[in-house]
Each structure stands twice: as C-alpha cells, then as structure tokens.
C-alpha cells in the first residue's frame, strides 16, 4: 500500500507525537536532564498542535481503513494535546524536587497522548483498541509515579488490575461483534446492524461486553469503583490527565462509533445506557457530598459529568445537536478540570510527599492568594453549571438534547444531579473565603502567576468566563467539527 503526501500531511499530529516519543527516549538514554526532556516534550506537543492547521488544508480522508482524518478527529486531537501540554506544565515544578527518576514522566505522558490522537481518528475497532491500550498502559506507570507513598502504589495496582479486566471485556466484545457481522470497521458495522439487534444474540452480547469495557474507562456507575481511589493516589498532574485527556479521547471515539453504527436505535441498548447515565449522575453527586478530599471530590464529580454526557450519546439520532453538545460540553469540562486540578498542582508543588488535597488546606486561601482563590471559584462554578461560565453552556446543551429527543426522565435526572452537585461545589467555594487557619499547612509559591502552570490556570479561567459569556466562537468551531460520512 502506498501512502500519498496528502495522507502523510493528514497524519502529521500522530507522526510528530510519535517522533517526539522516540527523541525523548533517546535523550534519556544519552543523558538525564530534567529541563531538556521537559522542553522536548512540550515543543513536540506544540508542533503537533500547530500541525493541525496543515491537516485542515489536506481535507477529510481515510488514511488506511483504520483511521479517518476529518474535522471531528482534529477537534478531539486538539483537546487531547492541550490536556497533555497542561499535564507536562503542571508536572515540571512538581518533579523539580522529586527524589527519583523524573524524565520518564514526560515519556509516559507522550505515549498516552499518542493513544489519544489515535482514538480521535479511529474508524475501526482495531484502531480503537490500539488507541485505548496506548492511553491506558502509560497511565499504570503515571498513577504510581510517586511510588514512595503507599497510596500512589495502591492506586496503581488497583488501576492496573481493573483496567486489564476492562480491556479483556472490550476485546471479547469486539470478537463477538466480529463473529456475528464479519466486520470491524465502524461504517461496515453500521450496515450490518439491523433495527432488531435483539434477534442477533451474538451481536447483543458483544455490544454488552463493549459497554462494560467503555463503562470502566469512562468511570460510569457501576464500573466506577476505582475512580476516587486512583484520583486520590495519583500525583495531581496525573489526575489532571486522567480526568481530561483519557476521558475526552475515549468519549470522542465512542460518539463516532455510535454515529456510524447506530446502536442507540435499539431500545434495549438505549435503556441500559439510560440506567447507567441516571445511576452515574445521582451516585457521583451524592458520594461527592461527603468528601473532605478535593481529589476524591473531583473524582466523584467526573462520574456525574460523564453521566450527563451519556444523554447526548443516547440521543444520537438528532445527530447535529448531539455532536455539538458533546463538543461544547467536553471543551468546557476540559478547561474547568485543567483549572481545578491546576490549582491543586500549584498548591502541591514542589514535591513534598502527599499532595495538598484536603479541603482544610484551601480554607481561607483568598486572604493570602486572592487571584488563585478567584480562579478556583470560577472553576467550581463552571463545574456546577452556573450561568456566565462555560460549564453552564454545556449543561444547557445537554438539557436541550434531552428535551429535543423526548428523554424526559434523563433530563429530570440531569436537573436533579446538577442541583445536588451545586451543594458540594459551593461548599468548596465558601471554604476559600473563610478565615484562614493559624498555621498554613500548604501554600502555592508566591510568584505562582508567573510560572508556566500558573499561566495555564489563568488562561483556563479566562476561557471559561469569556466563552461562558460569549460562546459563539466555540459553537462555530464545534459545528465545523461535524463528522462527515
């Protein structure tokens, strides 16, 4: 098979990230230098981001049967690379005083980013599985990166075992789907799916097993049990990556699969997904209420956010609006999560053992770091879906999709879940403005706003506010990113 120059241009982000992985690996082998390797990783990711401009010029195309490069894949590639860049930026000051090998961190983040880019373009179950494994395997190492602490090691072991189990479910599900349909391409699957999936027991069993695998990767109830422990045990920059890049890439490819192969047309599949969505919304929010650890709280809240997003997946028949909803919601979720985890990373840097993760550490933050407290407030309000923030635009879209598709019970659950969520987000926000404790346990550096991580956090806060008040640029961008058949 010959690859034309056009196809090479279409694959630029993938090739650049892959090349950066090799360069960083050789650089580590030659000489360990934290600054040099961090710079190489960030430069490589920035080049991959800029290369999207040339990919856009090349136009939509199928590069091999495994990958479809179009505006949709470019949008999700961009989000994954932004999340990876933020992870590297937050990790640099944290790793500066880390007592063990530091350089491999960037290597693992780059390999996971490569997996995310593969997922964004996947149009075949084989590339979907390769992408998911590429994103999951480095995370085993990243979650346990602070292995001197028992909690980080425990989180890594939990994540490794459960992730391996989920991958085997996913693979077995794909095998059954292949046994029934004889195809692994998304489009070909769509052609072999009849409206009466119920009468195709092999296909139904395969879809069920795949939903279990995806449910674990997206931490949906009842496959969510690892989430709070792993978010708490992983270093703050890794929790950032887990909450953003891996969720966004996997949900992006799941959305494409459901559009090309309309599984949600089957009443049985819709009912199962609906039950998972409602359980995730309510359970995620109810469990977050009792948390006194901010990383656990954000872990439970991510379960609820993915539950809201499932509404758009179930209503995938009203395609245009559904795809628009997922794009806007995930962009809002990305910037809100980057800001929230960014503040935790800034408070936890440089490395001093456990992260600054108890809510008590943030009590009275406003009185000595007012701008940082204001940023955290904006992020909490956005995650809660308060008007004037980007989070509100996403929630509004989700409810609009639910109403449009007549999914009344799901729309009711979104409203109820958001109301419960308001309580713990506001509890976190209020504690920032209480009188500070006599002795400050943890604090961010005084010049945090002039560090690279501080700049990322401030840009996220500005984007959340500006796009919350005037969302048209984002909506136009998401409309451009409609997948072409």
Swiss-Prot record:
| Record's bilayer topology term | Multi-pass membrane protein
Keywords, alphabetical: Cell inner membrane, Cell membrane, Membrane, NAD, Quinone, Translocase, Transmembrane, Transmembrane helix, Transport, Ubiquinone
Record InterPro entries? NADH-Q_OxRdtase_suN/2, ND/Mrp_TM
What are the protein's GO molecular function terms?
Answer: NADH dehydrogenase (ubiquinone) activity; NADH:ubiquinone reductase (non-electrogenic) activity; quinone binding
Per its record, the protein catalyses:
a quinone + NADH + 5 H(+)(in) = a quinol + NAD(+) + 4 H(+)(out)
Q: Name one GO biological process term.
A: ATP synthesis coupled electron transport
Question: What is the protein's major site of localization?
Answer: membrane
Q: Which residues cross the membrane?
A: 8-28, 35-55, 75-95, 105-125, 127-147, 159-179, 203-223, 235-255, 271-291, 297-317, 326-346, 373-393, 408-427, 449-469
Establish whether keyword Aminoacyl-tRNA synthetase is in the entry. no
Source domain of life = Bacteria
Enzyme Commission identifier(s): 7.1.1.-
Q: Could you name the Gene Ontology cellular component terms for this entry?
A: plasma membrane
Top-tier EC class: translocase
* HAMAP family, per database record: NDH1_NuoN_1
Q: How does it assemble?
A: NDH-1 is composed of 13 different subunits. Subunits NuoA, H, J, K, L, M, N constitute the membrane sector of the complex.
Per the similarity annotation, which family is this?
A: Belongs to the complex I subunit 2 family.
Question: By what name is this protein known?
Answer: NADH-quinone oxidoreductase subunit N
The organism of origin for this protein: Erwinia tasmaniensis (strain DSM 17950 / CFBP 7177 / CIP 109463 / NCPPB 4357 / Et1/99)
- What does UniProt list as this organism's lineage? Bacteria, Pseudomonadati, Pseudomonadota, Gammaproteobacteria, Enterobacterales
Q: Which gene encodes it?
A: nuoN
């Amino acid at each position: 098979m010959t690859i034309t120059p056009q196809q090479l241009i279409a694959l630029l982000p993938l090739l650049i990230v892959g090349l950066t992985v090799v360069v960083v690996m050789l650089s580590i082998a030659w000489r360990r230098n934290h600054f040099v390797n961090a710079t190489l990783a960030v430069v490589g990711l920035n080049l991959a981001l800029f290369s999207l401009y040339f990919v856009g010029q090349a136009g939509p195309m199928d590069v091999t049967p495994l990958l479809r490069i179009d505006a949709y894949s470019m949008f999700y590639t961009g989000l994954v690379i932004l999340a990876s860049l933020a992870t590297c930026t937050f990790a640099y000051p944290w790793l500066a005083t880390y007592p063990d090998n530091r350089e491999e961190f960037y290597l693992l983040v780059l390999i996971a980013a490569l997996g995310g880019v593969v997922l964004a373009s996947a149009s075949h179950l084989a590339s979907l599985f390769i992408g998911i494994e590429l994103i999951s395997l480095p995370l085993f190492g990243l979650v346990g990166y602070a292995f001197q602490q028992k909690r980080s090691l425990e989180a890594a072991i939990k994540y490794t075992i459960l992730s391996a189990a989920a991958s085997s479910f996913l693979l077995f599900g794909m095998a059954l789907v292949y046994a029934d349909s004889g195809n692994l391409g998304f489009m070909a699957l769509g052609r072999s799916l009849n409206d009466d999936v119920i009468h195709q027991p092999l296909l139904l069993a395969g879809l069920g097993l795949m939903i279990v695998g995806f449910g674990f990767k997206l931490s949906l109830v009842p496959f969510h049990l690892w989430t709070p422990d792993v978010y708490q045990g992983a270093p703050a920059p890794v929790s950032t990556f887990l909450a953003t890049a891996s969720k966004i890439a996997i949900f992006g490819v799941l959305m494409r699969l459901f559009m090309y192969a309309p599984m949600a047309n089957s009443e049985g599949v819709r009912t199962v997904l609906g039950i998972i969505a409602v359980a995730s919304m309510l359970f995620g929010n109810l469990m977050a209420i009792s948390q006194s650890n901010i990383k656990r709280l954000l872990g439970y809240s991510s379960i609820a956010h993915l539950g809201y997003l499932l509404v758009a997946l179930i209503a995938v028949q009203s395609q245009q609006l559904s795809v628009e909803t997922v794009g806007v919601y995930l962009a809002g979720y990305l910037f809100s999560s980057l800001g929230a985890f960014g503040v935790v990373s800034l408070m936890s840097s440089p490395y001093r053992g456990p992260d600054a993760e108890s809510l008590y550490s943030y009590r009275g933050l406003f009185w000595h770091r007012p701008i940082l407290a204001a940023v955290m407030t904006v992020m909490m309000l956005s995650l809660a879906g308060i008007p004037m923030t980007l989070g509100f635009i996403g929630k509004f879209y989700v409810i609009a999709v639910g109403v449009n598709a007549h999914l009344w019970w799901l729309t009711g659950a979104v409203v109820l879940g958001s109301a419960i969520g308001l309580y713990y987000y506001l509890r976190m926000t209020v504690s920032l403005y209480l009188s500070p404790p006599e002795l400050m346990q943890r604090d961010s550096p005084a010049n945090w706003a002039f560090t690279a991580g501080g700049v990322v956090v401030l840009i996220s806060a500005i984007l959340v506010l500006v796009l919350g008040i005037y969302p048209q640029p984002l909506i136009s961008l998401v409309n451009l990113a409609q997948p072409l058949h």
